[in-house]
């Protein structure tokens, strides 16, 4: 693809490898990007051997994922593809880990990555509920469920990066895609700090 890099304001080649050996090519021109990602996403979802719905383009002399190619008016398509890819990869991992901990009789919650539509595009979120230890997928947001699972008294959503900074949770070694282990429910003062950073997301 590097041989098709644009220059002088010309559109740059964009390509996607959705799976089953298929390759979708186009450019990052505004009138082509939407269709490129829509076709690639459908092929990815239908593939027997899915690879990725993410587009790749040229940044300088390097082939990079579309969401990491720097400022672009249509970067949102790359972020949406990243969210879908993350959720699908975590889905397989979540199923495996839940079966593993159940088999080992280990009291461990395994958080699930979910895709949500926000006013600023498709993103990922997970839940951290009050109770035993959790392994949280690295999503865009975390929703805290306060109280026993049947009787949640409060819930609020915080950016994942803020949770890492405030609580200090760390990634679990040897797990890909990354998960962060939360051994204890946050103390009341920590929970209050987290809630102060809460944002509004669509419910559903």
Question: Where would I find each of the regions flagged by the language model?
Answer:
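Surface-exposed, low-hydrophobicity interaction/linker segments
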Residues: 1-11
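Short beta-strand
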Residues: 13-17
């Amino acid at each position: 693809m590097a041989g098709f890099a644009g220059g002088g304001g010309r559109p740059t080649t964009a390509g996607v490898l959705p799976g089953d050996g298929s390759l979708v090519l186009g450019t990052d021109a505004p009138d082509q990007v939407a269709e490129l990602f829509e076709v690639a996403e459908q092929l990815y979802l239908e593939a027997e051997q899915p690879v990725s719905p993410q587009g790749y383009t040229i940044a300088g002399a390097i082939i990079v994922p579309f969401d990491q190619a720097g400022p672009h008016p249509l970067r949102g398509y790359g972020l949406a593809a990243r969210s879908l890819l993350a959720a699908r990869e975590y889905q397989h991992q979540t199923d495996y880990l839940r079966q593993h901990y159940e088999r080992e009789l280990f009291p461990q919650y395994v958080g699930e990555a979910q895709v949500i539509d926000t006013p600023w595009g498709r993103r990922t979120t997970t839940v951290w509920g009050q109770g035993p230890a959790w392994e949280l997928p690295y999503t865009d947001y975390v929703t805290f469920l306060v109280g026993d699972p049947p009787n949640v008294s409060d819930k609020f959503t915080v950016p994942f990066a803020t949770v890492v900074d405030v609580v200090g949770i760390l990634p679990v070694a040897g797990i890909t895609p990354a998960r962060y282990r939360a051994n204890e429910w946050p103390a009341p003062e920590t929970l209050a700090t987290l809630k102060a950073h809460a944002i509004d997301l669509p419910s559903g």
